[in-house]
Each structure stands twice: as C-alpha cells, then as structure tokens.
Design a protein with these regions (language model features):
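IMPase-like, lithium-sensitive Mg2+-dependent phosphomonoesterase catalytic core
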Residues: 1-50, 57-59, 70-332
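Alpha-helical scaffold segments that form or flank carboxylate-/histidine-based iron centers
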Residues: 63-66
C-alpha cells in the first residue's frame, strides 16, 4: 500500500493558507507535471510512432529541430497557458518570448523559462533526456510583459526544476527550501515523493565532460581532467561518466557526487549551455542540495542575463570538486 506523499498533497502542505498559495510558484506545478506526464508517455512509445527524427528546420540556437522537440515545446506551452498566473514563457525553441496572460484581469505573476527537451539528439538511441525549467516572479503584474523582464540574475528565481525521462520519470524541484524528487506512477499518472530533501555529497569521484574537446578547451580544464586521471596506489581516483544528456549527467552526479563541466571551447568561446533555462535553474537546485555551480571563475547565480538565449560555461556539482576545478582555472 502506498504511504508516500503525492505531488498534490505536497503542494497543499507547502501552502496551507489560500492567500499563501495565491502568491506561491508551486501553483504552476500541476501544469508542469501534467505536461511532463504527457511527454513521458510520448517518449516511451517514440520508437512505435512517427515522432522520431528531424523536422528539417533549424531553431534560434542554430540546431536541427527534432519532432519531439516541437511536441515537448507545444505540450508545455499548452499546459501552462491554462494557468492564469503564468504571464509569459521563454523557450529554447522560440526566438522571442511567448506571452500568455499579462493583462491585469489574468493576474500573470510568474515568468516561465524552459528547455522543453534537453538531450533530444539522444532520443533515437534510447538515452535519458529531460526538461529543465525556471520560474521568476514579475515585479509588476499589471503591465504588459517585455523580454527585458527576463534579464534577471539566477538568485532571483522562485522555483527551479527538471523532469528526467528514463527508466522512470522523475520531477525534481526547489522553491528555496531544499530539493525534493517525485517519481511518476504511470498507472495512476501521479507523481509521488520518492526522494525527499536531496543532498549531494560534498565531494565525489565522477567527472563528466566531453573529452573529445580536450584540444579545444582552456588549459585549466585540461589540467583538471589530467588531475582526475591520476592514480593512487595503482587505483584510479576518479571515474569518467558522460552521457551527452545534461539532465541525466547532472541527476546522477547530484545523487552520487561528481562534477559536470561544459567549458568554453575555441568553437564556442562563450560556452554552449544557456544561462536562463539550463544553467541558472540547475545551479539553484545544486546549491539547495549543498553543491556549487560556477562559470569557472564565479557563481552562476550572480550572472545577470543580457540576452534570452545567452550562453555561459558551466562547472556544477559537489562543492569540493567545483572549487578544485575553479582553482585550476585561476592557476592556468
């Protein structure tokens, strides 16, 4: 018999008063969970339906759009549009903001940022993928939304999370009071609390980086990966694990202890990952779990977004590992 808490029960317990709920970002969670459930179903039968492969067009990132990218994007937009408190969305798949509810009668208090399907290039080979999202509170919900409202620092987030679609589907999020993980029961289409108050180890053995870029990355990164390859008494001190799926690599490292690095390269001098809807939300999650997130020299959450699709380098994971990597960057 089930004894754990459902997502709906968790939301109710988090906002015991109606007035508190009206201003709390968790009121978007039901729509997020609904979209995640729908996308999870589609991913699970992707090989049996005509939804694998490319659409043939290119998104604002210069990336080939997958059929599932578009499905995921549309699914989350449609779900969130039903919540009058979501004023506008920034998505990896759209060049400009998507305005939903920004009139005074709609009370659109929140701004939603998302990568609707991170790692979608892995879908065709059945590797874990995910959705990353972030929520900010508007300073004035009586005005029309402009893209400048999204030019914020990550430390202004009021909710951040991700959904990982793998052997099971999990929703992991924070509102600033720790990190909690919920696993989807597909038989009831309900998320249940399975990983309460997640804490990441202060140190770890896993390092996740695309070492195929070794000749393209800064010297500090090369020196750090060489350090990770060192042995002690004939045994390795670290182990390399890189799936090429940000959510999957991050999720494993947060639970087991490790570091994920996507640095600048000569081909991507500003980094590859997007600040607003990839790096900032994961940075807040890892900090809430006791870890650290950096661009190699400073805190990710202190960076102010200057462009909707701004890219930054990312060093994220167990605090001691991130600090060690930062030291190598400073020394080289």
């Amino acid at each position: 018999m089930r004894t754990t808490t459902s997502l709906s029960e968790f939301i109710a317990e988090s906002t015991s008063h109606k007035a508190e709920y009206a201003h709390h970002p968790v009121q978007l969670l039901n729509e997020i969970a609904r979209a995640g459930n729908k996308l999870s179903k589609q991913i699970n039968i992707a090989g049996l339906t005509d939804i694998l492969g490319d659409l043939g067009n290119v998104n604002v990132q210069g990336e080939i759009v997958k059929k599932l990218d578009l499905f995921a994007n549309d699914t989350f937009i449609q779900s969130l549009s039903s919540n009058s408190h979501c004023a506008a969305i920034v998505s990896e798949e759209n060049e400009e903001i998507i305005v939903l509810n920004d009139t005074p009668d709609k009370e659109g208090k929140f701004l939603f940022c998302m990568d609707p399907l991170d790692g979608s290039s892995n879908i065709d080979v059945n590797i874990s993928v995910g959705t990353i999202f972030s929520v900010y509170r508007r300073t004035d919900s009586t005005k029309k939304v402009t893209k400048e409202e999204f030019f914020v620092q990550g430390n202004e987030q009021v909710m951040a999370g991700y959904i990982i679609y793998s052997s099971s589907t999990m929703l992991v999020f924070t509102t600033g009071n720790g990190v909690n993980g919920f696993t989807l029961d597909p038989s009831t289409e309900t998320f249940y609390l399975s990983h309460p108050d997640i804490k990441t180890p202060t140190d770890g053995e896993i390092f996740s980086i695309n070492e195929g870029n070794d000749n393209l990355v800064p010297e500090g990164v090369r020196q750090y990966t060489q350090f990770c390859h060192e042995t002690s008494n004939g045994k390795r001190t670290h182990t390399a694990r890189f799936m090429g799926s940000l959510v999957a690599d991050f999720h494993r490292n947060m639970l087991k202890g490790g570091i994920y690095i996507y640095p600048t390269t000569t081909a991507a001098p500003n980094g590859r990952l997007r600040l607003l809807y990839e790096c900032a939300p994961l940075a807040w999650i890892i900090e809430q779990a006791g870890g650290k997130a950096s661009d190699g020299f400073g805190r990710i959450l202190d960076i102010r977004t200057q462009d909707l699709h701004q890219r930054v380098p990312l060093f994220i994971g167990s605090s001691q590992m991130v600090e060690k990597a930062e030291q190598y960057m400073l020394d080289h």
